[in-house]
Amino acid sequence: MTKFVFVTGGVVSSLGKGIAAASLGAILESRGIKVTMLKLDPYINVDPGTMSPFQHGEVFVTDDGAETDLDLGHYERFISARMGKRNNFTTGQIYETVIKKERRGEYLGKTVQVIPHITDEIKAHVKRGAEGADVAIVEVGGTVGDIESLPFLEAIRQMGIEEGRSNTCFMHLTLLPWIPTAGELKTKPTQHSVKELREIGIQPDILLCRADRAIPEDEKRKIALFTNVPHEAVISVVDADSIYSIPRMLHDQMLDEIVCHKLNLLARAADLSSWNRIVHALKNPKHEVNVAFVGKYVDLTESYKSLTEALIHAGIHNESKVNIHYIDSEEVEKHGTGELEKMDAILVPGGFGKRGTEGKIAAIRYARESKTPYLGICLGMQLAVIEFARNVAGLKDANSTEFDPHTPHPLVGLITEWKNADGKVEQRSEDSDLGGTMRLGAQKCPIVPDTKAFTIYGAEVNERHRHRYEVNNHYVDKLEKAGLVVSARTPTEQLCEMVELPSEVHPWFVACQFHPEFTSNPRTGHPLFNAYIAAALANRKA
C-alpha cells in the first residue's frame, strides 16, 4: 500500500517546496524506499505548454511527452524515478475531466459540485500517479489561503482520513522573515499560516521553516507551542550555496526519521555519500570556464532551469566551476559579438518566435568562425543550420518559415504530418492550436559512426523533444556538400536530429534538435554536456 507525504506552502510563494520535497525523496530513496512524486498545480491552464516563460518559468518535458511544471525537473534530478503525465496535473485538467464525464452522463443527472466531484477527481488522479510506489510525495502548488488551492487542500484533507493517519504525513513549508530594525526572526507569519491550514482541517505533522539564517532553539519551541507541532518536527531550512546540499541539511535534522516514524516505515539507514561527493565537487573545483548563454529570456533564468543545472552537472564531472554569462540576443543584434570574445564556449538554447533570432545567428557565426566550442539546442540547432546555409552554402536570405513565411530558402519549416506518442497521425498548419501540437517526448534515433555525436552517445540517442518546426530535408544534401555533417536522423522521416562540423574545420561544434538537459542529473551528469564543458576547458582563454 502506498503511503503519502503531502507538502504545502504558506506565507509567500517561491519558498522552494519542490526542492524540499525532492530532497526528502532523495533521502528516503537512499534508505531503500521506492519513491515517486506528484505536483498539483491550481491554475486553470490545462498544462504550462502555452504559458509564457516569464509567467511560469521552464516547461519540463517528460519521456511520455507531458509538458509539465519545472518542479518535475527537480524531482528527476533528485530521485531515480522518471516522471510522466500522471505526475503533474492542473485545475484545468481536473475540470476538463469532470465536465467530459458530466457530458457523457456519468453522474446520472446529479448536480456536479466542487465537493464531491472535483475533490474526488483530484483524489483519483493522486492515487493513479502514486501507483507502484512505497511513498508518494505530493506537492500542492500555490500558497495556503489562495482561493485556487482550496479544492486541492480539501482533497488531501479527505485523503488523510480515508488513507489513515499512519499512511499520511502533512509537511508545511513557511517563511520566517528577518526584520533588520528589530534584529530578529518573526514567527507570527508562520503561526498564522498554520492557523489557516488548521481551519481547513489539516494539522501539519512537520514544519519546514525557511530563513536566511539559523533559527534559535527558543524560536523553534515557540513555533512548536503555537502550531501544535512537536519541537523536533520544526525543521530549520536556511539558505544554502547549492540546492544539492539540502538533502544533507534535512537529514542532519532527522526529517527522514520523523517521516518514517509517522508512516510506520522500517528502512535501512540513509546513505548520502553520493550527495556528499556532489557538494564537495561543487565547493572544490580545480578549473573554471566561462560559457556564453545567448537567449531571449535571460532576465528570468528560471526559463532555462534544466539547462542551467545541466551545465552545473557537467562542471561537477569536469571538476570545474561553470560561470554562466547570460547574454540577451537582442543586445547582440544591437552591439555586436564583442562580449563573446572572452568566453570559452557559446550556447544557444531553445525558444520560440522571431525576436532576438538574428542576434543568436550572429553569435553562432562568431562561434563557427572563431572556432569557439558551440552547443545548439532545438532552436539553437535550427539557427546553426540557417547560419551555415547563409554564410557557407551560399543560400542568401535562408530562414525559417516561423520567422519569414516568404523566405526564398525555407531551411526550417513546419512539419505538416507527424505521428504522435500514441501512434496517431496528426495534421498541423500555422493555424493549428498551439497547445499539444508539438513533437513531444522521448524518441530514439541512430547515430552516424565516426562523428562527435557517436563518440558522445554511441550508436543510438534517446532524448526528449519539444518543437513544432524541423530542418527542411530538401536542403540537407546541399548543406552536406558544403561541409555540414548530419550525424543523427529520425529512423522513419529521416529528419535532422543532430548536426556538427568536422574536427578538421572546427574543434567542437555540435547542435541537436532535442533537449538533452531534461535527462541530466548531478550524479552522472549528461554525456553531451560533459563533452561540451570538456571542450570549453580545452579552449580556455588566458
UniProtKB/Swiss-Prot annotation:
One of its GO terms (molecular function) is CTP synthase activity. Keywords: ATP-binding, Glutamine amidotransferase, Ligase, Magnesium, Metal-binding, Nucleotide-binding, Pyrimidine biosynthesis. Belongs to the CTP synthase family. GO terms for cellular component: cytosol. This is CTP synthase. The lineage of its organism: Bacteria, Pseudomonadati, Pseudomonadota, Betaproteobacteria, Nitrosomonadales. Catalyzes the ATP-dependent amination of UTP to CTP with either L-glutamine or ammonia as the source of nitrogen. Regulates intracellular CTP levels through interactions with the four ribonucleotide triphosphates. InterPro entries: Class_I_gatase-like (IPR029062), CTP_synthase (IPR004468), CTP_synthase_N (IPR017456), GATASE (IPR017926), GATase1_CTP_Synthase (IPR033828), P-loop_NTPase (IPR027417). Pathway: Pyrimidine metabolism; CTP biosynthesis via de novo pathway; CTP from UDP: step 2/2. L-glutamine binds at G351, L379, G380, M381, Q382, E402, R468. CTPSs have evolved a hybrid strategy for distinguishing between UTP and CTP. The overlapping regions of the product feedback inhibitory and substrate sites recognize a common feature in both compounds, the triphosphate moiety. To differentiate isosteric substrate and product pyrimidine rings, an additional pocket far from the expected kinase/ligase catalytic site, specifically recognizes the cytosine and ribose portions of the product inhibitor.
